[in-house]
Design a protein with these regions (language model features):
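A ligand-binding cleft/hinge motif common to bilobed small-molecule-binding domains
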Residues: 97-106, 169-174, 201-233
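Bacterial N-terminal signal peptides
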Residues: 9-19
């Protein structure tokens, strides 16, 4: 009798637990969602995540709280998301570096298959950007200076191994010049550094240098895309200048692996609308 009673009690608890989980999933979301961003505030990833996340919050009817966890080309933030509960209340902005961090040695078992992908959000080409008062009017001017001053050009990036590091290194190799790579925890600190004259060039996206270009403090010498930008149509592509290089960042949103299908569907809808808005 005691064994039968224990079995009945255990079975009842299991049923209640499963029912509670089903009810919670059916009411998803009913509390704030934490969105982890792999870069410092102010850069492309941060701006994209906050813009899309804010729209998604309105659609979902719950707050979306943003937390920046920069470091190790995004591995710090992405590892945190991967190890979080797969309940939909912790998600992350994942950048192109997600496909690179294992090869770079920043993390193990961290790649696109580690997550349930919610949606893609953006693609942004790199640029070759310098200060407007640098004296470099064209990319040819910059290359000539670099060849006359090997190793002296300070090129800021969003972290060693990041997509903007790859952009700067690819251009330098193709141009046959030696530069000094200076890593930062995101593109925003790198842009702040070039504005403060602590570095000389940044190979980041147009969005990240737009305010500096519009204020007349920065100048874009080239874009690393197949076609010229609609925002700066007078700026040539690297291909036009003889360099067969295109580098672009992409990003999106992801959740820990194993998210319930109905929860994932809610997030896909809300964040998909956020991207389209």
């Amino acid at each position: 009798v005691k064994k039968r009673l224990a079995f009945v009690v255990t079975l009842s608890l299991v049923v209640m637990l499963l029912a509670g989980q089903a009810l919670a999933q059916g009411n998803f979301p009913n509390k704030q969602i934490n969105l982890i961003i792999q870069a410092s505030p102010g850069g492309l990833s941060d701006l994209t995540a906050r813009t899309v996340g804010s729209v998604a919050a309105e659609i979902l009817g719950v707050p979306v709280v943003f937390t920046n966890r920069p470091g190790a080309a995004g591995a710090v933030a992405m590892s945190y998301v991967k190890e979080s509960r797969a309940d939909g209340y912790t998600i992350g902005y994942v950048p192109v570096e997600l496909a690179m961090v294992e090869a770079l040695g920043y993390a193990q078992d961290l790649n696109p298959s580690s997550f349930d992908l919610i949606c893609a959000s953006n693609i942004a080409a790199a640029t070759i950007t310098v200060r407007a008062d640098s004296g470099w009017e064209t990319l040819e001017d910059l290359v000539e200076w670099c060849k006359a001053n090997p190793g002296k050009l300070r090129v800021g990036n969003s972290g060693t191994g990041s997509v903007w590091y790859v952009a700067g290194a690819s251009w330098a190799q193709a141009a046959g010049v030696e530069v000094n790579h200076v890593p930062f925890d995101g593109a925003a600190p790198a842009v702040a550094a070039i504005l403060g004259k602590h570095i000389d060039m940044v190979p980041v996206s147009e969005m990240e240098v737009r305010s500096g270009v519009e204020s007349g403090e920065l100048r874009i010498l080239a874009v690393l895309s197949d076609e010229r930008s609609q925002y700066n149509p007078d700026v040539p592509t690297l291909k036009e200048l003889g360099y067969d290089i295109t580098v672009a960042a992409w990003g999106g949103f992801a959740a820990p692996k194993g998210l319930p299908e109905e929860v994932l569907a809610v997030l896909v809808d809300a964040f998909g609308q956020g991207v389209q808005s």
